[in-house]
C-alpha cells in the first residue's frame, strides 16, 4: 500500500495534468476537447467584441467601397456587424501575417475569417466535450448528437456556403441586420422558401417550440402535490428523490381526451426521444439544404408562368415570388453588378434590325 502511494506521489507533471483535465470532479469539466475549445472560443469572443466596437469599414465587395459595421463608425446594436472578408480575398486563408499591414488586414475584413474559423472549431470541440463528459460519466451519447444540429447549421452558413459561392464575402455577417440581409439575399439568389429541406427545418423549429410548450405545461399541470395549499407546489420536490414528481398517467389521460387517445404518449422514453429528435432532424435538413444551395442546387422555381390558350399570363403566387426575388436581387451589391444574374444571363437582342 505504501509503495502504491509513493508511485502516485511521484507521478509526472504531465500525468497530474492528464488527471486534472479528465477529472469529472472539477466544477467545470475541461476534457481533451476543452483544451482546444477554451482558447478558440476565447479568441473568437474577444476579437468579435473588439471588432464589433472598433473595426474600420471593410471592402466587402472588393470594389473599393468599404462598408462600416462597428459601433465607433456610426452603427448601433441593431445595424452593427462584423463585415465578411472581402471578395478580393475570396477563399484564401487570410491570417494577419498574410497582409502587408494590420490596416490592410482590417480593410479586407480579416477579423471575420479569424472569428468564424475559431468559432467553428470551438463549437465543434464543445460538441466533442459533451460526448467526452457523457462517456466519463457512463451516460449515453445523445446530448452531443442533438447539439450536432446547430453545429451543422453554423458550419453551413459560415463555411460551406462561402466555399460553394467561392468567397468568404458571401458568408453570413456577424450581426442582427447582417443576418437579415443574408436571409433576404439568400432568398433572392436561391429561392430557399421553396426548398423542401427549408420547409422541414421550419416544421422542426416551430414544431419543437410547440411540443416543448405542450410538454412543459402538461408536466407542470400534473405535479403530484406534496405540500399544503398555502405553499408552493415546487417546495414538495427534493433533488434526487426516487418518486415521480408528476403523474404521467394523468397527463396522458388529459391529452388523450383533449385530442384523441393515440395522440398522447404513454411512454416517457418515447416521448422524450420524440421531443429531441423532431427539432434536431428538422435543423439537420435545413443545414443540408443550405449546403446544397451553396452549390446552386436551388429551391423549386416556377419561371415558366401559367398561360391561357391565347398566350396571356395567368398570374399565380409563383409570379409574385419571382418578382420579389428579382427586386431583392437588384438591390443587393447594387454597385458591384449592372444587372442581376437572372437578367444578365439572357441573350442580348440583336441591334442590327
UniProtKB/Swiss-Prot annotation:
PANTHER family in the record: PHOTOSYSTEM II D2 PROTEIN (PTHR33149:SF12), PHOTOSYSTEM II PROTEIN D1 (PTHR33149)
Binding residues annotated for chlorophyll a PD1, in chain numbering: 198
Question: Would you identify the family this protein belongs to, as annotated?
Answer: Belongs to the reaction center PufL/M/PsbA/D family.
Q: Which residues bind Fe cation?
A: 215, 272
Catalysed reactions, as listed in the record: 2 a plastoquinone + 4 hnu + 2 H2O = 2 a plastoquinol + O2
Q: Which CDD domains match?
A: Photosystem-II_D1 (cd09289)
The name of this protein is Photosystem II protein D1
Question: Which keywords has UniProt assigned to this entry?
Answer: Acetylation, Calcium, Chlorophyll, Chloroplast, Chromophore, Electron transport, Herbicide resistance, Iron, Magnesium, Manganese, Membrane, Metal-binding, Oxidoreductase, Phosphoprotein, Photosynthesis, Photosystem II, Plastid, Thylakoid, Transmembrane, Transmembrane helix, Transport
Fetch the Pfam families from UniProt: Photo_RC (PF00124)
Q: How does it sit in the membrane?
A: Multi-pass membrane protein
Q: Which gene encodes it?
A: psbA
- Positions where Phosphothreonine occurs in the chain: 2
Keyword Methyltransferase attributed: no
What is the scientific name of the source organism?
Anthoceros angustus
Looking at the UniProt record, the site noted as Cleavage sits at 344-345
Q: What else is known?
A: 2 of the reaction center chlorophylls (ChlD1 and ChlD2) are entirely coordinated by water. Herbicides such as atrazine, BNT, diuron or ioxynil bind in the Q(B) binding site and block subsequent electron transfer.
Which cell locations does it reside in?
Plastid, Chloroplast thylakoid membrane
